Amino acid sequence: METLELQGAKLRYHQVGQGPVLIFIPGANGTGDIFLPLAEQLKDHFTVVAVDRRDYGESELTEPLPDSASNPDSDYRVKRDAQDIAELAKSLSDEPVYILGSSSGSIVAMHVLKDYPEVVKKIAFHEPPINTFLPDSTYWKDKNDDIVHQILTEGLEKGMKTFGETLNIAPIDAKMMSQPADTEEGRIEQYKRTMFWLEFEIRQYTHSNITLDDFTKYSDKITLLNGTDSRGSFPQDVNFYINKETGIPIVDIPGGHLGYIQKPEGFADVLLNMWG
């Protein structure tokens, strides 16, 4: 893996291929390896960069997180993630780059576009679970609070079951999300990663400060992506709302919420039709 030294962290990332830079931002998984099957499909057309977000995978903190980062209203980590992606983009290319964020990674991508539009050539938001600008934002914020409380009081299994039901996660995705790692070490790491996401992301990222105006001023750069196998899920409803209010196009893409690993060939074909 490649390394970029930043304030407070060593950011590590996979890089394959040739051509214009395309950065993938992972969601709750946090690590770029989940995009490697997709990168193989695109490496003849793009320099594909799949990043381990700060404090996930091989990336490491060189300074501790501030105590305030676990506050449900803190925007520290999502803003820091966005700054990391912008600094990575500038280190890799003198030109604006392509960016795709998936799930909470798409929320990071929104903040990249909002705060660092100069690094963005084109950007895609794949099934973003953000609620800030929705008419029923308070309802969804309370639901995330309830999920966190249930996990902390009744255990991870029950809480994640509620999470899947609340967001209407498709069966193809629920099966993958609940699949345990192959080794005991892997299962421990999986648990730690999930609990980190619970403490620092599920509430903070989904209710971070993004408005519809943040999209409209850059609408020519944005594509919304919804999976063909995850219809009816909450993240798709978010994209439908953005589309209704702004006119930014939605493109159907193969697979579900994890379509890039479920159907990488078809996922790549859509990206090449968009940007190739």
From Swiss-Prot:
Region spans: Disordered: 57-76
Hydrolase in keyword set: yes
GO MF annotation: an example: hydrolase activity
Keyword presence, Lipid biosynthesis: no
InterPro entries the UniProt entry points to: AB_hydrolase_1, AB_hydrolase_fold, AB_hydrolase_sf
GO cellular component, as recorded: membrane
Cystines in this chain: none
Pfam families for this protein: Abhydrolase_1
Known EC number: 3.-.-.-
Domain AB hydrolase-1: 20-137
Annotated keywords: Hydrolase
Top-level taxon in the UniProt lineage: Bacteria
PANTHER family reported for this sequence: HYDROLASE, PUTATIVE (AFU_ORTHOLOGUE AFUA_2G14860)-RELATED, MONOACYLGLYCEROL LIPASE
Family: Belongs to the AB hydrolase superfamily.
Protein name (record): Uncharacterized hydrolase SAUSA300_2518
UniProt source species: Staphylococcus aureus (strain USA300)
Species classification: Bacteria, Bacillati, Bacillota, Bacilli, Bacillales
